[in-house]
Amino acid sequence: MPEIDESRELLVVEGMITDQLETNRIRLTKSSSIDKKNLVKPVAGCIVSISDDLDNSWLLKESGNGNYITDSLNFRGVVGRKYTLRVNSNGKFPNNYTYESIPMELKPVPEIDNLYWERILIEAETEQRTAKEGCRILIDTHDDSNKCNYYRWDYTETWEIRLPYDVPNKICWTSNKSSQIIIKNTSLLSANSISRFLLNFVSDKTDRLEDKYSLLVNQYSLSEEEFIYWDKMQLMSEQTGTLYDITPSSVQGNIYCNENPSEKVLGYFSVSAKRTRRIFIEESFSGLVNLYINCPVDTIPPWQPIPYLGTSVWVIIDGSMDMPPYKILTDKKGCADCTVRGTTIRPTFWDDDKLNR
């Protein structure tokens, strides 16, 4: 969330609509001061609507935590139409201000030509250690019609977690949304073509490639004005870490206060067509970090009482039937229960890669 060096709270607007039949989300929060940068302040109770240039209007439903959503059955953006976001603060801000975006045209975006990965050698094998490998995920796209010159991508990673012990919650899945700003300008290129563009790098410092990994990428089209906005935001985020770290209030978005044009409003209302592609990686990579190497902390006979079992101590190996019998304990819950990092609910798409084989 953007952070500013002002005592007065300002409205922050984040969200977008697309041409897909899906739920679109607009999030409203209040800007935070320097000393409260980790405090997110959702704005509830506002009246949020979207209208187009044909005088159609849709009222968004409040879904909690500052989120306002469209009805996936009744709203779908149309390429070529212009959309305007309106926010009635409904008394949540002084003077009962209302806010409005500039009309935003929903621009087309080309299909994703290819999404693929490459194995990368991070450190070569030596007599003392095995090689360390990672993975680069790349994308190709082009637009012969030249209707899209400014691109933006985001993605969601999902990977399988398998504990090395036979415990009840052994297999889980977890997901992570991209936090970096990923954009590309082709307006100055001789051809509107993007080849081998790096989306993500998965290093050996994570276990994401240990079993099975998937990445879903979304491709969007931007106006030149929105590209300039994200380009400025990218420069700021490179200095501070990610999009969710400090963002100075000097980056002007496309939303304004009707009653007071000098009132500063943060964030951007994005409008774009969307194309998606998913990739699966189920290969063996050398030298990945072992997150479970320090799991065992004690070995006891099976008849010995275990104080705080299930609260601060867990059994990861039950060798009660072995000779001699034993149990191995850990003081790290994540070694005995994969739900510490994920969920046991299998993603509905997890076997989609096998359908094409």
Q: What is each residue range found by the language model?
A:
Residues M1-R357:
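A sequence/structural signal for flexible, mid-protein segments enriched
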